[in-house]
Amino acid sequence: MKELQEHELDHIEDDVYLLYLYTPFCGTCQLASKMLTVVKEMLPDVAFYQNNVNYSPTFAKAYQIESVPCFLLFKGGKMVERGYAFHSVSYLYELIKQKSSSASHL
């Protein structure tokens, strides 16, 4: 996953993308990152990015990030899913696949 800085977060141009938010010393975040790496390979039409929220306080506040790990899924410039529970690779795959191909929004 490509690491983005805070100033880049509002300028992503992909139609469908997932933004993974983490902190480096979070053990659960490390596991979630490995899961997303697998899912990324299975969903080539979805762009995957990551951001260390320690360096993005304005973004975290604007999107009301409550904890990490967290993912935000965007489609057509709008957030369509926010998740804190990563469950499993199959859960993430199905959720991202369904949300990225449907017209549903939060």
Swiss-Prot record:
A Gene Ontology biological process term: cell redox homeostasis
Disulfide-linked positions: 26-29
Domain Thioredoxin: 1-101
Family annotation (InterPro entries): Thioredoxin-like_sf, Thioredoxin_domain
Keyword set, alphabetical order: Disulfide bond, Redox-active center
Pfam families in the cross-refs: Thioredoxin
Domain of life: Bacteria
Leader sequence segment: none
Annotated GO MF terms: protein-disulfide reductase activity
Any one cellular-component term (Gene Ontology): cytoplasm
Protein name listed in UniProt: Thioredoxin-like protein YusE
Organism listed in the record: Bacillus subtilis (strain 168)
Gene this protein is translated from: yusE
